[in-house]
Amino acid sequence: MEEKKISEQESLELITRMINQTKKDLSVGNGDSFLMWGYLSAAISLAVIVMLLATNDPRYAWLYMVIPIAGFTVSGIKTYKAKRKSHVASTYASNTLNNVWAIISAVFAAYAISCLLHFGEVRSWNGMFLLGMLLPGIGTYTTGVILKEKSIQMCGLLGVVIGTGLLRDFVCGEQVISIMQMGHMVLSFVITLIIPGHILNFKAKKQQ
């Protein structure tokens, strides 16, 4: 009986160590990734809004393509360098998080390719706005759950709530993305990426 109690205690300690190791491994790196994607997405989105207001030329919407091109390039370089430097085995939780964000990235990429293959269907690109508001929120919420950070969970949920507003517009048959909806997307990037990034880095510095 005593042996069972010790086993349970060791199991709890192991789980706690794994969670703490995951937080230590992911906090700074993941925080920087959140910030890179968040500031890049928000800056490009604001640039598109300004140019559309100034010129009324919809071709400036192509600036949005800078986000995935620059974002995935920087992320790929950082991941490659991190793998070369790190000799610590990844935890199950960190692998799970990486897989979640990999799936989200794959969905974005697959939808973008589909839009390019049906280039003449302009309305299909509106779906990128919906994905850009919903999926980061889901990924951020999942990150918060795995890291047991309620503040990050709340940021993810708020992002999803903002995204559901755009989903309602699509269901009601709205065909054109408005400047206000673009502004909502900027707000979504701030809530789901920038704020969680600063939270993760702040928590990491406190643990050092």
Regions found by a protein language model. Give the residues of each.
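N-terminal juxtamembrane cytosolic/stromal segments of multi-pass membrane proteins
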Residues: M1-G31
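C-terminal ends of transmembrane helices
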Residues: Q21, G76-Y92, I138-L147, I194-N201
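Selected alpha-helical membrane-embedding segments in polytopic membrane proteins
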Residues: L26-I113
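Membrane-embedded alpha-helical transmembrane segments of multi-pass integral membrane proteins
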Residues: L40, I44-A47, A70-V74, P136-G139, ...
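Helix-coil boundary and interhelical linker segments in multi-pass alpha-helical membrane proteins
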Residues: I49-Y60, I113-N126, D169-I179
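Structural signature of hydrophobic alpha-helical transmembrane segments
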Residues: A61-A70, G120-L134, G183-L187
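Membrane-proximal helix-loop-helix units in multi-pass membrane proteins
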Residues: T96-G156
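Terminal transmembrane helical module of multi-pass membrane proteins
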Residues: G139-Q208
